[in-house]
Curated annotation (Swiss-Prot):
Part of a complex containing FRS2, GRB2, GAB1, PIK3R1 and SOS1. Part of a complex containing GRB2 and CBL. Identified in a complex containing FGFR4, NCAM1, CDH2, PLCG1, FRS2, SRC, SHC1, GAP43 and CTTN. Binds RET. Binds ALK, FGFR1, CKS2, MAPK1/ERK2, MAPK3/ERK1 and SRC. The tyrosine-phosphorylated protein binds the SH2 domains of GRB2 and PTPN11. Interacts with NTRK1, NTRK2 and NTRK3 (phosphorylated upon ligand-binding). Residues 122-131, 227-240 have a biased composition (Basic and acidic residues). A lipid is attached at G2 (N-myristoyl glycine). It is found in: Endomembrane system. Adapter protein that links activated FGR and NGF receptors to downstream signaling pathways. Plays an important role in the activation of MAP kinases and in the phosphorylation of PIK3R1, the regulatory subunit of phosphatidylinositol 3-kinase, in response to ligand-mediated activation of FGFR1. Modulates signaling via SHC1 by competing for a common binding site on NTRK1. Residues 122-180, 200-243, 270-297, 315-338, 366-385, 441-467, 483-508 are annotated as: Disordered. The keyword Membrane applies. This is Fibroblast growth factor receptor substrate 2. InterPro entries: Docking_Protein_DOK, FRS2_PTB, IRS_PTB, PH-like_dom_sf. Highly expressed in heart, brain, spleen, lung, liver, skeletal muscle, kidney and testis.
């Protein structure tokens, strides 16, 4: 064993050794850099070269590995002795080396999971991609830099003939030898999808796909050339997508809510123009004397939005949002003022919560205040006696039918609304009665004859006259005596030493 490590010659190691394999390190051009012996232990890969220095790769640091008929390659991580890189070795027993490494990884519960590098290929379809595990070192592939700064395919033209711990170019990307045909699963065409160990399931997912997203520029150009009028609808219905480009990944976002509103507004304006051209007599504009550009641009029928008016639901046409008027004006909407029309034309709010009304209550008399009782509004903000059908929110200029006014005025005349009544008045003191307990303090404190409290039946006078009973009597003589006693306490004249313990005067 020791002789093999010190003298790794071809003759010293048999060709059928269990865990030692004769390998030749090659570069990306297929040139041989040096021969050695690859040994697989329980924890790491060890490469012994002729100059007696060994290179170790721990199994936990291997990102992916693969094999060909006469080639074994793997990718190491940044924590390895050699750093990050892809290393390839020619070996006559490459398949045995791969199977043994995979068995060791499975026994040690080491899972190498790497997402495949998906690239576009114009010459070969997805169904022709072989499913054999292989490495990403395809011949002629352009070098790409990783986010951490290390090259994905290092160059080994200036590498020495033996591995070194300081140079990540100990191994090389897997490349075929001179004259070798690219017929093996590992030797695929340029820019081909690369699959590694434990990632064969990705190929099944890719085979199930039927189409590939086209770039955004192509889609927009085709949409403009074919159907320019249908472009807003296609943009509106488009979902966020992720497109894979040769230079990177492109994210295509869907339309924002503001864009959707603008596109819907354009649709409604177009629909209004069609209705005006079809039947112009029905959509008559009202003249209010205001020079409003918004009112002149599009018909007012397609812009009116009313929420919670009289609690009635407005019929809506198919394909249009709730609450929008698209048909001709009916008898109910003809009473609406134009000023309210101009305000609601610019405000298109939906799902607005209905606010409780605020009314100014008239001053109640004493009898009405007693008859109405306490004011307790209900949970929904309306009094029980009020009809919630009559709730006008954000419709200050809307004219309500006269029948509604009659009903509302009759209700307000019968029962004053009590919702949000800010008439805070002090209740009358005439009906109040104060019960108090009178205690005889002059009597003796004899336990045999306890004094029983007396509860008078007559109410207490509203204006008390004997206010002197509420004040305490001050004993002047006792106050002067306590003051003299306080002045007689010893004071510090500055001669005594003060410490932390006797710095304050202690009580006598």
């Amino acid at each position: 064993m020791g002789s093999c490590c010190s003298c790794p010659d071809k003759d010293t190691v048999p060709d059928n050794h269990r865990n030692k394999f004769k390998v030749i390190n090659v570069d990306d051009d297929g040139n041989e850099l040096g021969s050695g012996i690859m040994e697989l232990t329980d924890t790491e890969l060890i490469l012994y070269t002729r100059k007696r220095d060994s290179v170790k790769w721990h199994y936990l640091c291997l990102r992916r590995y693969g094999y060909d008929s006469n080639l074994f390659s793997f990718e190491s991580g940044r924590r390895c002795q050699t750093g990050q890189g892809i290393f390839a070795f020619k070996c006559a027993r490459a398949e045995e080396l791969f199977n043994m490494l995979q068995e060791i990884m499975q026994n040690n519960s080491i899972n190498v999971v790497e997402e495949p590098v998906v690239e576009r290929n114009n010459h070969q379809t997805e169904l022709e991609v072989p499913r054999t595990p292989r490495t990403p070192t395809t011949p002629g592939f352009a070098a790409q830099n990783l986010p951490n700064g290390y090259p994905r395919y290092p160059s080994f033209g200036d590498a020495s003939s033996h591995p070194s711990s300081r140079h990540p170019s100990v191994g090389s990307a897997r490349l075929p030898s001179v004259g070798e045909e690219s017929t093996h699963p590992l030797l695929v065409a340029e820019e081909q999808v690369h699959t590694y160990v434990n990632t064969t399931g990705v190929q099944e997912e890719r085979k199930n796909r039927t189409s590939v997203h086209v770039p955004l520029e192509a889609r927009v150009s085709n949409a403009e050339s074919s159907t320019p009028k249908e472009e807003p609808s296609s943009i509106e219905d488009r979902d966020p997508q992720i497109l894979l480009e040769p230079e990177g990944v492109k994210f295509v976002l869907g339309p924002t809510p503001v864009q959707k509103q603008l596109m819907e507004k354009e649709k409604l304006e177009q629909l209004g123009r069609d209705q005006v051209s079809g039947s112009g007599a029905n959509n008559t504009e009202w003249d209010t004397g205001y020079d409003s550009d918004e009112r002149r641009d599009a018909p007012s029928v397609n812009k009116l939005v009313y929420e919670n008016i009289n609690g009635l639901s407005i019929p809506s046409a198919s394909g249009v949002r709730r609450g929008r008027l698209t048909s001709t004006s009916t008898s109910d909407t003809q009473n609406i003022n134009n000023s309210a029309q101009r305000r609601t034309a610019l405000l298109n709010y939906e799902n607005l919560p209905s606010l409780p009304p605020v009314w100014e209550a008239r001053k109640l008399s004493r009898d009405e205040d007693d008859n109405l009782g306490p004011k307790t509004p209900s949970l929904n903000g309306y009094h029980n006696n009020l009809d919630p059908m009559h709730n006008y929110v954000n419709t200050e200029n809307v004219t309500v039918p006269a029948s509604a006014h009659k009903i509302e005025y009759s209700r307000r005349r019968d029962c004053t609304p009590t919702v949000f009544n800010f008439d805070i008045r002090r209740p009358s003191l005439e009906h109040r009665q104060l019960n108090y307990i009178q205690v005889d303090l002059e009597g003796g404190s004899d336990s045999d004859n306890p004094q029983t409290p007396k509860t008078p039946t007559t109410p207490l006078p509203q204006t008390p006259t004997r206010r002197t009973e509420l004040y305490a009597v001050i004993d002047i003589e006792r106050t002067a005596a306590m003051s003299n006693l306080q002045k007689a306490l010893p004071r510090d004249d500055g001669t005594s030493r003060k410490t932390r313990h006797n710095s304050t005067d202690l009580p006598m």
